[in-house]
């Protein structure tokens, strides 16, 4: 059990380094707004969840393409879904990123699902 916890902590550290140095920079350069990142504990699928707003589907697609290029350059698996809607999900290496239009974010209100999670960062 202790070994598993140590491995999980190391995984979070690796994600944090990759995450803070690269992923958030892409979101900011792509002018995504209201960015929140949560550290998710006791979840076998995600270690980090990021939620952000975009102004249009074009901005969403562009942001996802830039992230895909970054993630693939690190030889990581990348998955995206919902590119033609008001809510898209990107997944890679224990990180899930939800892109919302402002209206969709208010409607689905995912932020409240993570009220008990550690808020790692917030922009805007």
Question: What would you call each of these model-derived segments?
Answer:
Residues 2-46, 55-88, 103, 114-124:
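Polybasic/polar functional segments that serve as interface/processing modules
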Residues 51-53, 100:
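Short hydrophobic/aromatic beta-strand micro-patches
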Residues 89-114:
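C-terminal structural segments of small proteins and small subunits
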């Amino acid at each position: 059990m202790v070994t598993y916890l140590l491995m999980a902590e190391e995984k979070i550290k690796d994600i944090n380094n990759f995450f803070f140095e690269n992923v958030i920079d892409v979101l900011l350069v792509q002018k995504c707004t209201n960015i929140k990142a949560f550290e998710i504990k006791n979840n076998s699928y995600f270690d980090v969840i990021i939620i952000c707003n975009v102004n249009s589907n074009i901005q969403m697609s562009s942001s996802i393409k830039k992230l895909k290029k970054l993630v693939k350059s690190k030889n990581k698996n990348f998955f995206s879904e919902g590119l033609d809607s008001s809510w898209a999900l990107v997944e890679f290496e224990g990180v899930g990123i939800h892109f919302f239009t402002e209206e969709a974010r208010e409607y689905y209100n995912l932020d409240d699902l993570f009220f008990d999670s550690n808020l790692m960062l917030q922009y805007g």
